[in-house]
Amino acid sequence: MAKKRGKPEIDWTDDDKEIIWVSKSEIKRDSEHLKKLGAELIELTPQNLEKIPLDEDLKYAIRQAQSFKLEARRRQIQFIGKLLRNRDSAPIQDALDKVKNRHNQQQALLHKLELIRDQLINMGDASLNQLLSEYPQLDRQHLRNLIRMAQKEKQINKPAKNYHEILQYLKSELIV
């Protein structure tokens, strides 16, 4: 038996009970979007996957796809797209966007900390005082010692041990 190409959506709120046809191209675009959503879900870590509202069969299909290679993975992505067609994908997409945005925010914060570290080493006490006014919980003596040692390492071209330690200290104190 042949499948119908277009899927009518009946809008019962209209007075004239008009049937709205969805084109085959639109159905294909929606399916392709859901497959891409499924592929993005597969790339998530298990911790991030738990933050997304998925039912058990969808979680199971995603976990299986994470262990597959190449062609089996492609088929599993198609299957996940099929499972997503029967569900409301808006909350899943919203949760995925939040998870991805959190990663971008963490990357931006790390970049900011690297800039602060470079300022501390290049400008010395002036930038240290400014940093301590913004973040009074930091240990002035420890930071000053790390900065002094990093400046010495830079002058004599030693490996940048304290340079990295400043960043680690800032990350441990400022990133919650």
Swiss-Prot record:
Localization terms from the record: Cytoplasm
Entry-linked Pfam families: DarP
Keywords in alphabetical order: Cytoplasm, Ribosome biogenesis, RNA-binding, rRNA-binding
Gene Ontology BP terms: assembly of large subunit precursor of preribosome
Cellular component terms (Gene Ontology): cytosol
CDD domains: YjgA-like (cd16331)
Function: Member of a network of 50S ribosomal subunit biogenesis factors which assembles along the 30S-50S interface, preventing incorrect 23S rRNA structures from forming. Promotes peptidyl transferase center (PTC) maturation.
The protein, known as: Dual-action ribosomal maturation protein DarP
Species: Haemophilus ducreyi (strain 35000HP / ATCC 700724)
Source species taxonomy: Bacteria, Pseudomonadati, Pseudomonadota, Gammaproteobacteria, Pasteurellales
Record gene name: darP
